[in-house]
């Protein structure tokens, strides 16, 4: 009998910064052990938002760029472009499996994959904020109930999947990939000169990051965020550094808003510069999903300025404080965090499900182990 040495052909689909960052180490092992086809959908594509991260993290050029957002007039239009483009790509590439991470529109590429009976592996499965106003919450439920193998980060996310009727044998908890990513790039992060470049004194400035649709597109929420930013600058008399996402910049361009003189807007930074900036800030105020993991792993004080969130495991350790969009809650949070030590002796333990050094190897082995399982048990394909 002749041994089949053909590598598994896996297609991974990304379209935003968080996906690129979280999958950076996984791309490396897939390139080594599989026939890996890397696809960028073009969901968010310009140098600041994407290419700078490919360069910074030394990720190879994608095999395909789909440009789904070009001339798109609506979210529905973008999603339609995605499904059509990805389906045509599947016909060309003929992958053995697809890997997606998270809850972006790009992850909806699982829909044509399902129709073509391609085994689907979903990282970050099971995250729930239980708020239908959050567009990602809708995507999460669609992706989770289409995917074949679910790879949640936490035990809580695993329980959510079970309660929604997902079979236990199709759920494998892997932990967050961010510990592996941050530790791999930590030497480069520490070498960053971003604080001196921006003329900032360590622990004497704030970092603010806001980009979520429910915060920016709502005038009520956006005005609350503006008030928070100005009040922090006014009361602390310290620089407030804001890395501007295109959605945020677009909103700022439409409205003539007066900001405090201590508020500084900068273009989006590369991964290593931005993480360094967060590590040396007095406090980070953010509506990002990643802030819970980053603040827990790297031990810096952070406030989550959202009304809902999807990482309760972070709250169990107090890794980040949820303060919503009310000024009084923000300032109470800042007062509590002012004594948080950044030294090696932690005040707050790292979240257990984030303290995982080998997620990339886990994912590689799970994909190799479960492609045949999906083909046999889901699609009844018998060789």
Q: How would you describe each model-predicted region?
A:
Residues 8-14, 19-29, 33, 53, ...:
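Active-site and donor-binding regions of nucleotide-sugar-utilizing enzymes
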Residues 32-62, 68:
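N-terminal glycine-rich anion-binding loop in soluble enzyme alpha/beta folds
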Residues 43-46, 51, 190-280, 381:
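Donor-nucleotide binding loops and adjacent catalytic segments primarily
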Residues 43-48, 69, 146-221, 323:
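A nucleotide-sugar donor-handling region in carbohydrate enzymes
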Residues 100-101, 107-110, 122-123, 150, ...:
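A donor-sugar binding/catalytic signature common to diverse glycosyltransferases
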Residues 339-383:
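C-terminal amphipathic helix plus adjacent low-complexity
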